Curated annotation (Swiss-Prot):
It catalyses: fluoride(in) = fluoride(out). PANTHER family: FLUORIDE EXPORT PROTEIN 1-RELATED (PTHR28259:SF1). Pfam families: CRCB. The keyword Transferase does not apply. One of its GO terms (cellular component) is plasma membrane. Fluoride-specific ion channel. Important for reducing fluoride concentration in the cell, thus reducing its toxicity. Its main location: membrane. GO terms for biological process: cellular detoxification of fluoride. This is Fluoride-specific ion channel FluC 1. The chain crosses the membrane at residues 7-27, 35-55, 63-83, 101-121. Disulfide bonds: none annotated. GO terms for molecular function: fluoride channel activity. It comes from Rubrobacter xylanophilus (strain DSM 9941 / JCM 11954 / NBRC 16129 / PRD-1).
Length: 124
């Protein structure tokens, strides 16, 4: 990795983290604390974005690095998903914990697939 690519990827990852914090917090505030909607939203949007990127530019190494491994990796959060799911389960909210895991996986796979198809279509 060239120094410029490293710098861009680091900056993009930082920007993704800030965007996750802002969007996740906004969604959580709007939807309420009963379910981790903010994390679900950022992870689904991240999957959609990665699908779009992979579909539109599957061989553009620099773009995949900066936007995929940088921005979108900083934006999405597996660890928060696990923590929020564990918190729901230990609070006796096992149905919500299960819904969080299954819903995130299903929505993430759907968003990734839809994004990849849309990206490939847009790229021609």
């Amino acid at each position: 990795m060239a120094p410029a690519e490293l710098a861009l990827t680091l900056a993009a990852a930082g920007a993704g983290s800030v965007l996750r914090y802002l969007l996740g917090g906004w969604v959580a505030h709007r939807m309420g604390p009963e379910f981790p909607w903010g994390t679900l939203a950022v992870n689904a949007l991240g999957c959609l974005g990665l699908g779009l990127l992979q579909g539109a530019a599957p061989h553009d190494r620099a773009l995949l690095l900066v936007l995929g491994s940088g921005l979108l990796a900083g934006f999405t959060t597996f660890s928060t998903l696990m923590l929020e799911t564990a918190n729901l389960a230990t609070a006796g909210e096992r149905d919500r914990a299960f819904s969080n895991i299954v819903g995130t996986l299903a929505l993430g796979l759907f968003a990734l697939s839809a994004g990849a198809r849309a990206g490939a279509w847009a790229a021609g």
